[in-house]
């Protein structure tokens, strides 16, 4: 029996196949099953073009058999089989695809896409085997042939006996090494898991004889093992079924089967697109946040299938980061894959699918907000933070997509409201969208800075997430209305008369404020009369783009650079405390320093900032109480 050499620089190419193209050894089973599916597809195609042939679906299947004792794994199919010449051409020439040639020579009917295109999948068998045998009998032929290879040195082909047409691949599984455990590819559980993972939606049954137990007939307390044939794969994926025939329970069951979460999805999206690129997709918006969602360990992405075969567990390129919470699958026959089918080539089709999915998710969320407000608010409680990160990231380039999905607590409505709802209620004389920042709604309601805005009857949005103000800085405005913090220097609510009064107060008490500023040198940029305070004696305002709350967030980060906002100490001229300040300035400079330090530290505490010297602060309080 003559040993023939592989063509196409066999040794180097086969070594490349085994060591470089595939990153996961378990992929071999996916590739061999896909080849078997292609072989059955070819039989089906012949029945479409030859009226004398009938396609009885029950006659066509793929069988996987494990023989642990002899370290043999078999993958058999009832497909079209191969002649001697086809064995020579398809298996003797690495990177020649019989399926691709079949597709070129025949117009494959819609609904039956032949998977193979590179002619390399078969050689993934050498990832787990160093002795590969193929026994095949071509449809319509009386002759069968056996192809065998032990690696890059070559292969043999000889006649053999085989009753039915089809192909059987026999792998002699490698022995274990220190680095690799090959025994697992003989275990029923592992084989079943790999089939479910990669080939669950192959359209033909993938059968295995599984070991089970039952009570012995003569002794019910003892159990015996027996074999039972099972079809491992689901075959018809839910995304290819008619949406009108599916119920909510079907989607919820699929969500649970895929282990997307322990909750029920708050919304599912089933879409089928035909056009420049065709695909089916089922997307789920979870109800609750995964435990690791806001950690670097979380990996976004959708399951990606090509013609029902899993290509990627999580294709991150299909989802923008701000929609990274979405779970689901995409299946398309139009994708450009690399030679191993493990890595997707970044092409126009993928980008188009991703763009469509992004738009679909946005539209569904807007619909949920409009029609099922309670559900949306529950979703927003879990994932609103991610949407705000989306506005902040990439220098605000996504703000137009996300701004109408944002919600904040309202001082007026005492509930979450959208920016559109806020703007729709603004009085004609209101120039800005006002917001206040704090650790909680309760803390914000007690802020001195909020008094003046509420006194005007204006609505204030409460920002309690550390990302809120950063996101708004990127948003800048909404429907031509700028955002304004209640702690900012100029609130834009003072009338001309009040403005003049305030300026007059600053001039009249210029020397007092200068003295206080000197006492607080390096701590505040200025001391001035307040235009916003009603009942509180003092507060801190900020000048510039960096707010006091942003300072707190940035300085809480690792490797912070002790960033400081420009602070202004504002004094309520109508409060009794101011009278004490004036008296101290006129008669007791030491007492003025004491009062100034106390008021500054009081303002720091109101803002949730640490005071520099707590001991001195408490001693100063004691001095006043003497």
Swiss-Prot record:
Keywords, in A-Z order: ATP-binding, Chaperone, Cytoplasm, Nucleotide-binding, Stress response
Gene name per UniProt: htpG
Xref: Pfam families: HATPase_c_3, HSP90
UniProt-listed PANTHER family: HEAT SHOCK PROTEIN 90 FAMILY MEMBER
Extent of Basic and acidic residues compositional bias: 498-509
UniProt-listed InterPro entries: HATPase_C_sf, Heat_shock_protein_90_CS, HSP90_C, Hsp90_fam, Hsp90_N, Ribosomal_Su5_D2-typ_SF
Name of the molecule in the record: Chaperone protein HtpG
Region (C): 553-626
Oligomeric form and interacting partners: Homodimer.
Protein source organism: Clostridium botulinum (strain Kyoto / Type A2)
Region (A): 1-341
Region (Disordered): 490-509
NCBIfam families per record: PRK05218.1
Family per record: Belongs to the heat shock protein 90 family.
